[in-house]
């Protein structure tokens, strides 16, 4: 019987298997940020240990930093965490993308753009959305603080091998429909626990047509379906993306030969399999308090089926049977590790070019990294957004989570390109609606959701 991509990635990294069936995995890349690392570094200090492979460890500041004035950190805990990371990286000789550095940005944005993320690697980070890197054919997953310490100390991690779930995506995406809509559709149809105990492998015609940045969006949100990780077999698009980046292999041809072996064999069998045709897929909007509570833009909000639905409708201030077009959008956030890359900003800019944000709507564009921001500005995207009435910010996690100054006021609705819509995620009482960058941009213009498929834009942009 053939092997799945998961099998090949896993087997390449097993150091030893213990009597309980746990495998000790070697970790190729450890990404670190300011929130989940302080206790881990302190554990090393108390045990008189060092970081075993500092050259395989890379840190950045992203969760806590302000995006309007990055140096004006008024929150005491946030400042302490940032200062602590800076001190820890200096003491333990770990590379740090500090505030103001050209490499700084959201951890799951800078990993790929610096060439740190590569096919065949095992990648961990103290962050749920580490699965993003799986778009490159890497086995990437989030870990807890105690595990962060273990990896820092040993460059290994004890893990039980998950099952393999195949998700075949067939057909061509319609105009105005993106990877974000695919994953929201999957979550709406199959729920937040469908991938529990599995690694999701996305494959098929739709995947082959996708660029790397949309593939990252898919893998980023695999965790929202309960999966350990999301992965996609690397191809020529992957190799081309990695080639020439700062930390990419210099002997490129040697590595691409090895990377080309990373695919699921034709006779391999998944433990669980789903097939979805995206040909008639519509843009999605979430209405509730987890990412599976979503509907196509042209459908009404569903009936209440259980207590969770009852609570969600109450928290969101919405009702069954209500149209998505009736939801009042007061805030728009285009950013996060899900949708803050250059192609995301290009799509949003193509929607708003020459138009104006609706009066009373606060709209933020937060690039995922310094590099994304600079490249966007070279193309004039910042002018398009600012002329439309958006705020053009510095890179950071921003409004994705209520850990920095960018928050949504209680009781107000936000169209967000982030990945989670839990209660209080964007601030106390904030009401979050997950959408694609195109849908978020359009909502900023109207003050409510619209069907982007009916808007007069072609998904491309002229920089003249």
From Swiss-Prot:
One of its GO terms (biological process) is L-leucine biosynthetic process. The keyword Acetylation does not apply. Its EC number is 4.2.1.33. Pfam families: Aconitase. It catalyses: (2R,3S)-3-isopropylmalate = (2S)-2-isopropylmalate. Keywords: 4Fe-4S, Amino-acid biosynthesis, Branched-chain amino acid biosynthesis, Iron, Iron-sulfur, Leucine biosynthesis, Lyase, Metal-binding. Its cofactor is [4Fe-4S] cluster. GO terms for molecular function: 3-isopropylmalate dehydratase activity; 4 iron, 4 sulfur cluster binding; metal ion binding. InterPro entries: 3-IsopropMal_deHydase_lsu (IPR004430), Acnase/IPM_dHydase_lsu_aba_1/3 (IPR015931), Acoase/IPM_deHydtase_lsu_aba (IPR001030), Aconitase_4Fe-4S_BS (IPR018136), Aconitase_4Fe-4S_dom (IPR036008), IPM_dehydratase_rel_enz (IPR050067), IPMI_cat (IPR033941). Pathway: Amino-acid biosynthesis; L-leucine biosynthesis; L-leucine from 3-methyl-2-oxobutanoate: step 2/4. Binds 1 [4Fe-4S] cluster per subunit. PANTHER family: 3-ISOPROPYLMALATE DEHYDRATASE, HOMOACONITASE, MITOCHONDRIAL-RELATED. Belongs to the aconitase/IPM isomerase family. LeuC type 1 subfamily. NCBIfam families: leuC, PRK05478.1, PRK12466.1. Heterodimer of LeuC and LeuD. Catalyzes the isomerization between 2-isopropylmalate and 3-isopropylmalate, via the formation of 2-isopropylmaleate. This is 3-isopropylmalate dehydratase large subunit. It comes from Bacillus mycoides (strain KBAB4). The gene is leuC.
